[in-house]
């Protein structure tokens, strides 16, 4: 006799199962009969609802799938259309608000009603155009005039002596010589003559 496998160990589960079957056999038979009846009723109901022709069945299935796909596409297109409309409305509102803010920030001139981005640009405009304030160079002997302080300061800060020379002085081969600005700047063919002198001054009224 084998010590590892005691006797009747293999036959015990079989005996337990057989005794359980003998006790519960009538209940199991009733359950099987009920399940068979239910399955038969379901099959008869399904067969009465479905048409006999297989072509009609396939056509119905195809039409249902087509209707479902069309409904899904319509829902998606409506959703995408709504999102696009919302984005367009938001961008238009943002553009409107940004243009309104830009218009509010801009400053208009009281005299000519031109608009400028800030008060500094408006001040430069009024002093240069309407008040005709001219700013002369601070270097002695230069005498050049500018419409804005910025350009005057940029000119004055440059140490190049050629920039600060008077307009009437020109460089010749040997040194400095005095000449009239009309003769040096304009050719003789543009000058009208001594009887009708050309007014080249930029003093606008």
From Swiss-Prot:
UniProt superkingdom: Eukaryota
GO BP field: cell fate specification; negative regulation of transcription by RNA polymerase II
InterPro entries per record: Disconnected-like, Znf_C2H2_sf, Znf_C2H2_type
Chain segments carrying region Disordered: 145-168
UniProt keyword Transcription, yes or no: yes
Tissues in which the protein is found: Expressed in the VA and VB motor neurons and at lower levels in the SABV neuron pair.
SMART domains given in the database record: ZnF_C2H2 (SM00355)
A cellular component annotation (GO) from this entry: nucleus
Chief localization: nucleus
Keywords, alphabetical: Metal-binding, Nucleus, Repeat, Transcription, Transcription regulation, Zinc, Zinc-finger
Subcellular location: Nucleus
A GO MF label: zinc ion binding
Classification via Pfam families: zf-C2H2
Zinc finger (C2H2-type): 107-130, 135-164
Function noted in UniProt: Probable transcription factor. Involved in motor neuron fate determination and maintenance, acting as a transcriptional repressor to counteract gene activation by transcription factor unc-3 in a subset of motor neurons. Required throughout development to repress transcription by unc-3, probably acting by binding to specific promoter elements. Represses expression of DA and DB motor neuron-specific effector genes, such as unc-129 and unc-53, in VA and VB motor neurons.
Name the record gives this protein: Basonuclin zinc finger protein homolog
Species assigned in the record: Caenorhabditis elegans
